[in-house]
Amino acid sequence: VRFSLRPLFARCALAVALPVAAALALAAGTGSVHAQQMPPGAKQPSDFPHTKLTAGMYVINAAVAANDADREQGLMYRTHLAPNEGMLFVFGENAVHCFWMKNTLIPLSIAFMRADGTITDIDEMQAETTDNHCPRNNGVYALEMSQNWFTQKGITPGMQIGGLPQPQ
């Protein structure tokens, strides 16, 4: 009787390779689903104008959404934000501006501000929901940051955000 380890090794390799290949295929498929959701003509993060803002001792690198198309896209389809990175929404009118999280893949915090940069409201928003997030007060700016950013940095209503561009 001849005994060989070759069939045993082949079965073990197959038992390991199949689950690994399935996991990789699933991960690749998940990533491509999000990539496919970005509509043609949507701006990449680097395509937005950027500005530096201050919140207390923190410097924020903010993409600026100052027109209807940019405000509509906002942070949709983004899979992460760098530390101290966010998006500033600039409105031409002093009003209640509501937000939702449709096609927004990461949870965010939002601060609503008056024309002088004073924060009136801060809210936490869950990814991919259509719940309305509206401030209690009129304003001309909103700043979206990673979830809990304002809380973690000790930024509260009544404080001011500096470096804001003038509303148009």
Give short role names for the model-derived ranges:
Residues 1-9:
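N-terminal secretory signal peptides that target proteins for export/translocation
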Residues 3, 22-24, 67:
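Exposed boundary/loop context
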Residues 11-29:
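Bacterial N-terminal signal peptides
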Residues 30-35:
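Sec/Tat signal peptide C-region and signal peptidase I cleavage site
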Residues 36-168:
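Compact, glycine-rich, soluble single-domain proteins
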